[in-house]
């Protein structure tokens, strides 16, 4: 495990919280940029007022009686 050598330089009690904070800030930044760009607002603004989908049910055709000879 070559990546495990980082903990010889940085203590896990310091490195793990910094890594988790970095991941959380990156996620907030990405979502913020998508929201400002309008990619999240386009469907989010319509979500609370969305109407249920209209489903049309078609009756099954009646079976055709077989001719008896």
Swiss-Prot record:
Record topology, Periplasmic segments: 36-69
UniProt keyword annotation of S-adenosyl-L-methionine present: no
Identification of the protein by name: Light-harvesting polypeptide B-800/860 alpha chain
Main location: membrane
Compartments (UniProt record): Cell inner membrane
GO biological process entries: photosynthesis, light reaction
Any one Gene Ontology molecular-function term assigned to this protein's record: bacteriochlorophyll binding
Subunit and interaction comment: The core complex is formed by different alpha and beta chains, binding bacteriochlorophyll molecules, and arranged most probably in tetrameric structures disposed around the reaction center. The non-pigmented gamma chains may constitute additional components.
Chain's role: Antenna complexes are light-harvesting systems, which transfer the excitation energy to the reaction centers.
Binding site for a bacteriochlorophyll: 31
Similarity comment: Belongs to the antenna complex alpha subunit family.
Keywords tagged on the record: Antenna complex, Bacteriochlorophyll, Cell inner membrane, Cell membrane, Chlorophyll, Chromophore, Light-harvesting polypeptide, Magnesium, Membrane, Metal-binding, Transmembrane, Transmembrane helix
Membrane topology designation: Single-pass type II membrane protein
